[in-house]
Amino acid sequence: MLTSFAVILLGYYSVPPSLLPDSRIVRLEWENLDVVILHFRQYGYFENYIRKIVVEGVSYKIYNSTHLVSDRGDYLKYLATGKVSVAERLLYGVTFIIYGREEPLDGHIIFWGKILLEHDSPPKTVTVSLERAVLFFPSVHLPFEVNVEYIQNLSLGEHPHIFYSKEEVPALRSMICNEKSNPMNVSFPKIFSYLKEMADSFLTESYFSVYSGAMYIYLPPNQPRRHPDNFPYWTGISRELQARLETLSLIYLITGEKRYAERAKSFMLYISTWNQWTDPDYKCAGPRTCLDIGHISMGMAIAYDWIYDSLDAAEKFIIREALISKGIIPAYTEALEENSWLQNPMIWPNGYAIVISGLGMASLTLLGEDPRAETWLNTAINYIVRWMDKMGADGGYTEGHTYASYATDFTSRFLYALLKYRGVNLFNHPYMKNIPYFVIYSAAPDGKSIVNFEDSSLDAIYSWKETMAMAASLNNNRYAQWFLNLTGVYNRIIRSHTYNGIYHFIGFNPNIEPLNPEGSLPTSRLFASIGWAIFRTGWKSTDVLFAFKCGPWGSHHHLDAADFILNYQGVWFAAAPGYRLSTSTEAHNTLLIDGKGQVSGDCQLTGFFNSSFIDYVCGDASRAYPIEGLSFVRQVIFIKPNLFLIFDEVKASKSISISWIMHSETGSSIDISGSKCTIKRNERTMIVNVASPQRFSSSRGSTEDLPYIRFNIEPSNNIIFLASLNPTSKKEEESSISSLFYGDYTQIDFTSLEGSGLAVISKKIGYMLTLQNISSDASIFGLIRGKKNEIKYFILNGSLLLGEGTSTVIRFSKRGFGAVKISVSEVSCEIHLNETNDVSIYSPRKPLSVYEVGGAEIPYKYDDAQKTVTVTLKPGYHVITIKL
């Protein structure tokens, strides 16, 4: 018993806490205020009980949960975080407790007031002594020498200035208090009530957890505990903290109620004492930065700006210094470092956007307070422009919609704050102007899901908020406003990515009239920057969406070059696994070759054309497979409104086998009968017919919960496989397909809703083929005999198409793409050219007029002998109408 007591006593005496070198006293001379910062690390197994802290002979002890009292009767605010807590013990009363070896390893005691005594010359160091109590024995004094730092003046910035100036706050309050009708049917008073309820819950919660309880954070938040596994716990933690900081501070800004500012302040002071704002146990892209630092920096910056008037001088100093040393400096340093991941946005696009936008917002907040802020801000601006330059000028985003919305919405906040405070408008960058179309074209017909290629979820459709709102309010993109109306994300609080509840009131204008893209936008669009093509029949709930991808390899990609998905009236008959399932080729709608999937590799789209009755895309996925000399080209012809022809040609220097796979959404039923497959779901049907000159077998299975059909084609060194997809809701919408395979071409006869037709896929470009009285030298050509005495011709990558009776339908001086409709009263032609071209179009007689879409007449030459109108057209997309 005595031995045990002696060991305990020895432990208490022999292992005092260690005071780390950054401990100091900061003298804020203009305020005549001193801030004592004591940073502890405890190495022993035993608790240390600190009853008093003595500075220059003056003792300070705990008065209550917020203040110390000196033996001179002065009251000083204090903070105890991390390894240090305050509790009452029977023998010691209310005391600081510095815990033993268990985590966290670090802790702080910070207090401020008039502390340093008058000196003839300012001291460089001061002795700080801790009075440690040990049972009934006399107290032990632990002396430490700490440096004294003198700050002559702390520049005071103008606050608030992030999103709202002081003069704009009354208008914000008025907007929230007054119910006004608007085209979006958004009620700001109702939304504010939801947000205030959230803030009220933040006032009283004692903890939150992340990743289904994998880690708990008790509030106010100490630095999270260390963890042995390489998992990004801090990403979830930082997002949750950002949500609380922004929500509490916004409610304070609007209501002026101090309790919200006090709660936000307590979080900020605790976070300010963390050793760093990026997880030390997660191996991220860089040693100093990850998603967490971006989230914490932005949340701390916005809260600092909005509750600024509730902070005393010491609190401003503590938070500002942390924002600089733990948020700005690590991101700024890593951005400028040679070979850093922040030198190249494509290494990790979403991570780059989060870190740089966090740096930008923090720098913007400190303008006027630190002379370095201009340099930091300019760096953030230059780097975010570099990021936008690397994203698609056409609006395409490489990592899929979950990360596209995450990165771009986060960036939009920084850009909007920059615009509001500095007048720098980066929303006119091509990426920011065009990404709304990437979103709009990707939305499922029923508006309840979105294209989920790469690491993306179907419900990412509800994650798009700020980018779309700011596109509408700043660039007058009424289609973006329509999308927000479709998803309804501004009619309620959706914490997508967990942190963005406050942005209903920032950059969103409910008075802009939405514009439905139906009938206004082309129904299909190419996003060449990422290798995506999206075909649609429109934006009604009864429409079809087909998406195809074959592009460069990148972050968060799947091994699925030449993949496709199809949504018919809300049903994903051809489905992607998204973020929840495998990234392997087997889980996607593409080919296995010799039973094996793809490896990472840059692939490309090699052809695209869209028109009113036929769309086309071609992708070369050869480089995705580790087989020397392999060629895999997939071509898709969309015969509107509901027939898709998918034509695969695989060549190799040796005999190979392939497996053609297509998955459907969970709950789909699949029936296979020979070469025909019927998929049913929610009273909708898709019929799949397949054909090949090689023999093949069929099977069914599932990748986790996604059922699939699989066709295994016998080995050959030149394999052709044709699949037709025909989604329907009625028997009369079913198409019929027959195909013939020849050495140089494939002939496909079909019937569809629009009539009967022919498609020819040629292996010999530039070689004239004649079938069923039409001839062409194109890669693909054909016709549809419409039910309304209308003939429709198409030529894809060719120079000449001769129609029935050998008359010229269309001739290009250089190869092009065209779709021609011939009726009694007019000939219309949709054309895509890669270079300037003289184009001759069939006209049975001299036209009354020739004009391009929009009504502008264009000059032409009419050849009565050839019955053609010739026009000269520049590269690009053209719609020509010949009035007869």
Regions found by a protein language model. Name each.
Residues 13-40:
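Extracellular carbohydrate-recognition regions
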Residues 339-340, 366, 403-574, 714-721, ...:
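Carbohydrate-active enzyme catalytic cores, enriched for enzymes
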Residues 140-228:
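Low-complexity, Ser/Thr/Pro/Gly-enriched N-terminal "stalk/linker" regions
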